[in-house]
Amino acid sequence: MRVALLTREYPPEVYGGAGVHVEYLARELAALEDVTVHCWGGDRQSAEGGPEVVAHRPWNALAGSAPHRAALETVSVDLAMAAAVEGAELVHSHTWYANLGGHLAKLLYDIPHVATVHSLEPLRPWKAEQLGGGYALSSFCERTGLENADAIVAVSNESRQDILASYPAIEPERIMVIHNGIDTAEYRPDPGTDVLASYGVDPDRPSVVFVGRITRQKGVTHLLDAALEIDPEAQLVLCAGAPDTPEIAAEIAGKVERIRAERGNVIWLEQMLPKTEVIQLPSHATVFVCPSIYEPLGIVNLEAMACEAAVVATRTGGIPEVVDDGVTGVLVPFEPP
């Protein structure tokens, strides 16, 4: 079967869990079927034995200013992807960035469209801060793609319920739950400390570690608001980059500056690190923190637990389906009881 995977993220341009998911899904599917990945960005080299990779860039002829232009660029890539997948027998889209492309391919070529839901636009109202009026367009792309998909994959049972609540037109039997997974041959404790040393992290001192994008969804602002409650001897290590907007980037920078002035011991790695480097952070963490306010699954917790880190995470979304409270981690209600 010729399968077309549509995604915004694909290595080396990965900034979130959806990109991690698609990387491994494409690798494993390519061993079984004829798979082509259609993604955003610069040209990629197709790995030997792996899927063919075709990259698409937004149309540079689009006019307009940020933030709504970003949503228009997404539609331009969706159109390009839909045109490029001719000959596929099944199209599989990931996130709102590709859902419309999957739907258009379904209509054009009369092929099944499968959509994996990694998050839902109705449950991320803060996206209006990032996209402005483009948030209405991103919501339209997602709704159109999902309501007309032949099958939908939810990454947790809680996410399945969220899909049904957000889009009542979707019949329950169209949704199946397949939890995200990770490659434990890659994510395992790394005894090395060279990466830590290069970023100024002392492996012999306790550390509280956060890894994630700078976005309202990941709750990093709430972690920083609680930072003064952390033992001042502990290092607060933030591996946090790819801010949604300049405004939230400035907000985080201001909070970090104030915390440093009061307690010190804050190490902020402002770039998204490669996977091989990130693994050392949870491998040596005293506590790995996931303060998300919305998380359909939270693949970062799987990665941390595979590195034998103790996880403290919010009890939200699909997190309780992978973090066993009191066994593999501690779950904390987002709102005070």
Whereabouts are the PLM-identified features?
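Aromatic "clamp/platform" in nucleotide-sugar-dependent glycosyltransferases that forms part
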Residues: 293
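Short hydrophobic beta-strand element within catalytic cores of glycosyltransferases
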Residues: 287, 310-313, 323, 331
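Nucleotide-sugar donor phosphate/pyrophosphate-binding loop at the beta->alpha transition
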Residues: 111-114, 122-144, 161
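Carbohydrate-associated surface elements
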Residues: 158, 181
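Short His-centered aromatic/hydrophobic patch
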Residues: 93-98, 117
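Nucleotide-activated donor-binding/catalytic signature segment of Leloir-type glycosyltransferases, i.e.
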Residues: 240, 249-272, 276
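A conserved mid-protein helix/loop that constitutes part of the nucleotide-sugar donor-binding site
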Residues: 20, 206-210, 215-229, 250
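Short alpha-helical donor nucleotide-sugar binding micro-motif in glycosyltransferases
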Residues: 280-285
